[in-house]
């Protein structure tokens, strides 16, 4: 059997590579214009020496992939760039593609991907679906199980028939029940808080309290990834101890540092450097997952969204789903996120339900790609893919209606 090509087409970052790789290649899914008007595609962003006032454009807007003109250039950068990745796509006609797309993709937009894959790149076959649909096929022991009291137990390998996948990415957070490998779209819920929202809120908070950083997208994203954490117990508990968790971030001076860094204890401060002292900002911003009212968003938080999702599945499955929650997506790299989710959800559930959250041991952003890798070795993949000859015979409408569209499950 041929080794398929896996592409986890995230809105922030594309994870891609042949299925025989242990870890994927990674490329940012964006086009960046620096303050001098020069354009940098994908990972070329790392070559920018002055990160101030950079403008970033992404192919995805409001969770939908709407700009294939830009996305195709980024795919070319990924697939035909041996100088950076040490690998390139040779003959796409002999390559099978497994790709991801966002949940509830509008059918007309979903057809665009079919046309690009089969008509522009001419792949031999394709299988695409949301990342959550691949997760139950992950048989590797890459998870820690966090219980409702915060305890951690060893994960067991094997296919799980009932899982509640919480995919928290850059655009938003999806909560999707997957029952025997089939997504239960009737109960799928969306929380409009993701990495992009956290960046925006952190910008506003720092600009109001310290310096104007509304045009410093790259800097703020770096501060979020290095410094922010979820309150392990509660917001009020962390607020009382904010002095203990205070962080001093040395802002870039574009001579000794291009993106800034966290000052370590007893580390000398350069005389010409500016210091950003962060206290409650570090945990107030991630806390919006559980309490959106902090940012004046009058919508349910993550726990309420999960409970609403669970209430829409058959009653006999509800405790099974709650005890098999899988946390994937880059936002679960935020410290204490999965543990806090388990404890908060346990308080809201009936006493005879046991909440368990499966947390990736390493990088949660890569867990979707690793699940796709496991899926590529199953008979389910062989039976569900669409070949190029089938596409040319039936057309894009047939692919969306009978194979890839979510409407057939509703």
From Swiss-Prot:
GO cellular component: cytoplasm; cytoskeleton; nuclear periphery; Swr1 complex
Subcellular location: Cytoplasm; Cytoplasm, Cytoskeleton; Nucleus
Record has tRNA processing as a keyword: no
Gene3D superfamilies documented for this protein: 3.30.420.40, Actin, Chain A, domain 4
SUPFAM superfamilies: Actin-like ATPase domain
An example Gene Ontology biological process: chromatin remodeling
Highest taxon above the source species: Eukaryota
Pfam families found in the cross-reference section: Actin (PF00022)
Range of residues in the leader sequence: none
Keywords: Activator, Chromatin regulator, Cytoplasm, Cytoskeleton, Nucleus, Transcription, Transcription regulation
GO molecular function: nucleosome binding
Coiled coil feature spans: none
Assembly and binders: Component of the SWR1 chromatin remodeling complex.
Function: Component of the SWR1 complex which mediates the ATP-dependent exchange of histone H2A for the H2A variant HZT1 leading to transcriptional regulation of selected genes by chromatin remodeling. Involved in chromosome stability.
The family this protein is said to belong to: Belongs to the actin family. ARP6 subfamily.
Stated name of the protein: Actin-like protein ARP6
Organism, as annotated: Eremothecium gossypii (strain ATCC 10895 / CBS 109.51 / FGSC 9923 / NRRL Y-1056) (Yeast)
Chain's gene name: ARP6
